[in-house]
């Protein structure tokens, strides 16, 4: 396509590749995505529900255009150059493994290469380019990294190398301005790394930043003195029925195809949304010869208010308004209709876009009548922008919700000064990474941030503040007037229906999210229960919508209402990070910060009286409440957060019946005796989970396929023989097996494995589903749950316990159960009881969904490892690797060294895992005692019971049953002496 007619021509050779066996023509220098869309192949990735997805964001953030290239799956078509002879296919929802074993190898390495630099600029758009130039001009050494093959970002998009103009100049002033900056960058001795992914951010206690990047398939660490975050924004999702159909893309994604790669989807194309970008893209499509069905604008551009605001904007930037009027004139000449005051109500079609339903926007922001229907083949959606805040959130930058330009939505924006400084010393945020403001404002912020970063590094900076500050103020005034002209009352969720898909990655609908509000009511809990936000995009295109869906007034709260940010920022191959680490004993304990109290709006009486009050709504507390309520006991559960919000919702879901390797022998705490004494309880509780899986109201993904602990030396086999003998003496049927038996169960097992121990009673469960199911069962039996209630005072008088919470409410009960997990020590202290519980955060890692590779619970005889595959195909990797706490907010967060070591063990045991990418890591608080639970009534505190345990998810149901029996019957069928508080007194005496 000759988009600007006579001026642009191809300067690269034409090549061919195949897509699903069909020959496709392309131009060397295009991306696979551009070539596929231009050829009319709009479907790329297959979804969880069976449908297909295609090119959407065009900037590598959404992962909707994934394809399989020459057998390598998970390739982003929009970021991957086309090559002669490639064999390209749809990407399946579950990644298939290579048959070629040689592809399983990972390059051995002792550590990741570390690159030191004074100023690291992340992002090569307007803000990043100007920031890099400003910092370098002041004398600082600068490294600029960008994920794309060419610099310029979304605004200064450059022609790909496949095309050029006849006179050698850029096709238009916008592109030329970007080229000028890029040329200045090249001449300024600024190191620039393109095609470079920032995958992780780690902030150490001494405030050293470690930025994980991937370049040419190799992971590196950059250690800068200052970081300038200039990652820009993504387009805000507009969920309506049909918005996931192939052929629906963001306006920016549509523009990238056109401006950089001279291609577009087959017309007619409809451009819809809110803001001037839509007019620009529609006009550029017209000039390129693409059939444009119309422009849908939710604002009333012809209203007197809009015209007056346009006049104000013109005073600040007449050339920009002139460009906008030029776009309107182009559309008018081409007889392209502009439907102002309308929004898309639905996009219709079976497997591709066929037509679009439009509705007028009412004064209240709803979609009205009558509807209009337009036949189209592709749609560009542009309903505003949202900052890419992953890096800033990981670094601990404070954020707030700010009004999004012209719409009714508030978006998460960074708290920053005009020069980009924020609450984290050495971190600077420039341009739309901190909040939307347009390219000209981003240039000014970039210049100011670059100078401030150089000053932070100790350089004397030429005072250009006055000029750039003036430019900043000028364009802030311009943006305010411009977006006042585009002001629209349209509500963000006006077009959503029950069946509308909200999470594109996992195919989760609005109805599923709304149904999941009970017993959950925050984004993190909904994420755990529904999987919304667990896909490759990590919630970029659904978290804000989920947040609004669970709030009755469609409003957002604070940054803490979103799930805690975690690494990796974007998926990265296991093999790139796997590094062998040494082994250790024990757990790394931390002092936990006070957990945040959620703001639950409840209208409850000032005091509540019950028979039993349970403190803690994790698996142990919920199981206790369920067991008590089923026996007719009036029971209430308190939690400062939401049910399943801490360790119970953050563990890997292993059901352990045999001892882990670090719970036996010289690595074991307290010699291993307490852990061994707990094994019969674990065995019984695993069976109780099996019974509950048949009784609870939903599938908790319980599976009991057994567990294998593998060995790769004769010494490790002898260790397992001793461990298995102990387990058999306790009634656990653990048997030694050879390599042939392991290979029969696990064909992908490493050749290094010579044998192992097999326990058929082990299994797995989905903790994200299991605890909520227990909560519902408890509620159905009459238990009440009160969230947002942090316990502040516990007293005992006249045979009653009184618990006062942060709301000022008083709960009175004859008996209190301390099921507060890692905070059980705090609760005990309030009641005058010393409960020796410590917090030790542990990490978990999850990969992309894959075809079945492991059907058992897998562990290692001399390494920290647990490994299993979830029902949907994700491989979950854990095994007791330590995590830490983020600065300054105290989020539980994996450590880089633990991620590297855990991945090494996993791929060492199952080499095929090297083909998979890590989707996310997270950490949860492990309850560190001595290897055994603390159960039962405290003798000198009548009516105060402990139900506290490590390995809590395995033991949860039985702990609940035992505690309920003690309360209702005054006894348990189990010998609880090994699990009483008295054992610590005996240890002290000894």
Question: PLM features: what roles do these ranges have?
Answer:
Residues 118-143, 281-286, 610-637:
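N-terminal Rossmann-like FAD-binding beta1-loop-alpha1 element of flavoenzymes
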Residues 175-192, 198, 324-338, 757-815:
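Helical element adjacent to the flavin cofactor pocket in flavoenzyme catalytic cores
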Residues 179-213, 286-390, 803-804, 811:
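A Rossmann-like FAD-binding core segment of flavoenzymes
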Residues 220, 654-741, 864:
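Dinucleotide-binding Rossmann-like beta1-alpha1 core, especially the glycine-rich loop
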Residues 429, 433, 437, 455-462, ...:
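Active-site lid/adjacent beta-loop-alpha segment flanking the redox-cofactor pocket in flavoenzymes
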Residues 339-403, 424, 431, 479-550, ...:
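C-terminal catalytic lobe of FAD-dependent flavoproteins
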Residues 137-155, 293-302, 630-651:
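Glycine-rich FAD pyrophosphate-binding loop
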Residues 50-51, 71-120, 157, 177-268, ...:
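FAD-binding core/adjacent interface of flavoenzyme oxidoreductases
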